[in-house]
């Protein structure tokens, strides 16, 4: 059997930054440090950080007064920021800069007098954080069908922003539906969706043309990983989401000669290697990597951490 690895795959710059923030906070402050919500949606990453001394909580009332508290890469509402300040917490914000960019865009549109529409999935931490960062009502739209249910007059000045981990194709369809529905509408281009989301989805579309089965390494609660699996399925390829090699099933490959393998933006490369090992246990295996876009994006760490490093030097 032949395995073709997607390129790019796995960790994005926002995830790398978030994990490094937790690790540096532990190095500088000692354990424990407290992280609100999973730092990224991957249990292997979370367990690794937990073993190093990070404690994961859902609400700040679980954090002792004055302790180090880290916001996850998905972002938080302004009320959470205010709560942290009131509790005297030493806050490190690991919100992905591309998510913060969405917050800034949304506030700018509202300040310009437009009603704001957020394209995203209800209940996702990024969506909840974005809604909580906008000082006005935000209308959440999850599908093209929901556009038809909007009651705003067609000439209402509106703007849209999007969750960063959505399907590029689905998002484009919703934007086009909004543009048909409203006569005065502005918003970022679909190219403004996270670079890593676009690159991984494009790689999977290309990969799906070459394989009999697609495996996506990622967590079930990872939005971007689920979108990769969906793209494979929509391309007509049996596609499976696995957390690691233990979830690989031999029957998936009964008639397969070529398997595509990718990973969501929060999935570590060690889990990709674990899946390859599981496939190798099924029989002879040839592994190749597709040609693809090389990513060189890096995001700066919070000044609080870099200043501490400078003092140590």
UniProtKB/Swiss-Prot annotation:
Species assigned in the record: Burkholderia pseudomallei (strain K96243)
The protein's Enzyme Commission number: 1.17.7.4
Chain positions recorded as (2E)-4-hydroxy-3-methylbut-2-enyl diphosphate binding sites: 41, 74, 124, 164, 222-224, 266
Residues the record lists as binding dimethylallyl diphosphate: 41, 74, 124, 222-224, 266
Protein name per its UniProtKB record: 4-hydroxy-3-methylbut-2-enyl diphosphate reductase 2
Top class in the EC scheme: oxidoreductase
Record text on cofactor binding: Binds 1 [4Fe-4S] cluster per subunit.
Catalytic activity: isopentenyl diphosphate + 2 oxidized [2Fe-2S]-[ferredoxin] + H2O = (2E)-4-hydroxy-3-methylbut-2-enyl diphosphate + 2 reduced [2Fe-2S]-[ferredoxin] + 2 H(+); dimethylallyl diphosphate + 2 oxidized [2Fe-2S]-[ferredoxin] + H2O = (2E)-4-hydroxy-3-methylbut-2-enyl diphosphate + 2 reduced [2Fe-2S]-[ferredoxin] + 2 H(+)
């Amino acid at each position: 059997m032949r395995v073709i690895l997607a390129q790019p795959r796995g960790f994005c710059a926002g995830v790398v930054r978030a994990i490094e923030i937790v690790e540096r906070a532990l190095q500088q402050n000692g354990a424990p440090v407290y992280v609100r919500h999973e730092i990224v949606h991957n249990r292997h990453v979370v367990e690794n950080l937990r073993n190093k001394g990070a404690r994961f909580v859902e609400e700040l009332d679980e954090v002792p007064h004055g302790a180090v508290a880290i916001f996850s890469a998905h972002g938080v509402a302004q009320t959470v920021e205010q709560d942290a300040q009131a509790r005297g917490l030493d806050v490190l914000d690991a919100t992905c800069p591309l998510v913060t960019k969405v917050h800034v865009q949304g506030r700018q549109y509202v300040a310009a007098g437009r009603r704001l529409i957020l394209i995203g999935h209800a209940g996702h931490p990024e969506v909840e954080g974005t809604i909580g960062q906008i000082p006005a009502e935000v209308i959440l739209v999850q599908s093209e069908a929901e556009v038809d249910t909007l009651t705003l007059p067609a000439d209402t000045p509106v703007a849209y922003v999007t969750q960063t981990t959505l399907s590029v194709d689905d998002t484009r369809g919703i934007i086009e539906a909004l543009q048909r529905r409203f006569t005065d509408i502005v918003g970022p281009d679909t190219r403004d969706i996270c670079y890593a989301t676009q690159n991984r989805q494009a790689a999977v579309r290309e990969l799906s043309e070459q394989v009999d089965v697609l495996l996506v390494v990622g967590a079930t609660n990872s939005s971007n990983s689920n979108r990769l699996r969906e793209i494979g399925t929509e391309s007509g390829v049996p596609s499976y989401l696995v957390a690691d090699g233990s979830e690989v099933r031999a029957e998936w490959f009964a008639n397969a000669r070529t398997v595509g393998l990718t990973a969501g933006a929060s999935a570590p490369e060690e889990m990709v290697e674990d899946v390859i090992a599981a496939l190798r246990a099924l029989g002879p295996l040839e592994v190749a990597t597709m040609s693809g876009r090389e990513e060189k994006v890096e995001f700066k760490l919070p000044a609080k951490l870099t200043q501490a490093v400078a003092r140590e030097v």
